[in-house]
Amino acid sequence: MEKNKVILEYIWIDADGELRSKNRVLSADKFDSLLDNFPEWTFDGSSTGQANGFVSDIILKPVRAVTNPFIKYTESYLVLCECYEKCGKIPAKNNNRFDCDKLAFVDKDDFLFGIEQEYVIFDRLTGLPYKWENESMPSYYASSNEFYCSVGGQRTFGRHIVEEHLQLCLEAGLTICGTNAEVMASQWEFQIGPCHPRAVCDELWLARYILQRIAEKYNCFISFHPKPFGPDWPGSGAHTNFSTWQMRGQDGILYIIEACEKLRKTHNDCIAVYGKYNEQRLTGKNETANINEYSYGIGDRNASVRIPLHVANNRCGYLEDRRPGANIDPYLVVTAIMKSLQNNNDYDDESGYDSYS
């Protein structure tokens, strides 16, 4: 048992929006667990699409550290990092946290966010969704009403991965607030939040990392593709719930409607950062709105933005933006939503909410 060592798993986002990681071992007597004292590191950016071979060093700057739930025998942390070029001042390709961080720092609206991450578990050996027998499985596996929040081995595939993910996210201290089986066999969802803007994005990336590491153990991989199958099969989204303090306050419904109208004006700008291949998902079918149209409604899962029924009844709360695809970079989505709403409001109160669906 190496109690005199500390293991740091450095995690970053590459040029294609995929996760990378590597670890280093430090002496415990020289380690300070304050984040500001976590050492910077470098990696070969030419091997991740973030640099060329002539100036290939990319700097890793730690920005969030949580307990590493995979290592029990000594002190260890998962260390989320931003990537920088050269002297450490220029954000590297795909460092979208940099702009999100600047906007969140001046957040006068006290935004809270929650993100519902859908995904499909695939078997690495067959290339098919987990426990599917062959690629010509009847369309029943995609269109039946049996799979959403299902129970039972004949229709629920991969629960051991989902429950292990929940457990390890809790051990890491992440704000994971639920899981459920989704509308297609082997499709699942977990939720992160409610958190402030930067935190919800950091935690979603860390939760994705933990999920993908668990999948490795079972010869599986995780797909966040918005439409992993044909046009008639369900897609995977990252429904993004959010509110400002005014939306959460008395008669917040007025500000909720105002927010819906502001999002109408920025629909195209939002869609541009709501995930690659998302046009395959936003077809107006399978509980989605058409990508070329904007709509909102109470309890309407075919709308671009849904006002939950209990929010309308309470006249305050939050919105659910149903447009983001499962493969989003959350920093881009959160930034787009905040920019859409932060144009002429100057708030100075606060309240809270603690649930969303």
Regions found by a protein language model. Name each.
Residues M1-S357:
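Glycine-rich, acidic/polar active-site loops that bind/position phosphate-bearing ligands
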